[in-house]
Amino acid sequence: NRMQALVIVAHGSHLNPDASTPTYDHADTIREAGVFDEVRTGFWKEEPSFREVLRTVESDEVYVVPLFISEGYFTEEVIPRELRLEGWDLEAWDSDGTSATHATFEAADVEKTVHYCGPVGTHDAMSDVIVRRAESVTGAPEVGEGVALAVVGHGTERNENSAKAVELHADRIDAMDRFEEVEALFMDEDPEVDDVTEFFETEDIVVVPLFVADGYHTQEDIPEDMGLTEDYRTGWETPAEVEGHRIWYAGAVGTEALTADVLIERAADAGADVGDAIEEVRRKTRTAGTNGDVDADSGADADADADAGAEAGD
């Protein structure tokens, strides 16, 4: 039986300690499930780097899952290059911009087989994480009736696929017929999150940003843009009263514990033997509640990293 490893690759940050917290949390959750011989993390802006991470792995069979929201510069160019995947070609993913699942390559310098997976943010199961995030912020496991949901992301300016991912999940959740209204909103194009109250008739609006970690966008820009607070440093109420609506602002979806499930599902889709880990993690994270409380003191991430932008959701 060949050993199998899961490697989670994420953006990280030199300046914002919150950037990598979800990556470590989800890795711990998956380790506890015990289905991979090894669970490792690699970062663009922290150690171990993408370039070095495969050297920290003993297993021959490696499942690499990007903790990114969308397909783009990082998932299509940076990560395959840094992992030195032999013969990497975007065609291998055969994707329309949101449909990449996995493709298998050799990483010759470390003599490992790498199953390179699509990002977590485009997987169908991410819709469930957005819903779970809404449950967490409202404290209501049955949330939906009489409540609207806004899924927020970057617009197309930096990466067309980023907007596609936001729309994909808004459409999927809308089709669940669980919430009164569901809309995709954007930071830099119409329909803009600044005008959130104009897009809903429902009084209660849950707002979930499709970002993998909390950073300046989720903790500064969006709360101020929506009018939750004049100054993010002073914090905001949950829910906050804005123009006759109550806004329940959830912070980055990727801080939700259930995100670990999507990482496992990506690897399973690529052929990993995950036993009953998916059910186990779903059960455990339901009882664990959220590990991503909404607070306004997470500090600024001045490391704007324009490229990472849309894709990491930051």
Question: Where would I find each of the regions flagged by the language model?
Answer:
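Extended amphipathic ligand-handling, pore-lining, and cofactor/metal-binding catalytic surfaces
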Residues: 1-314
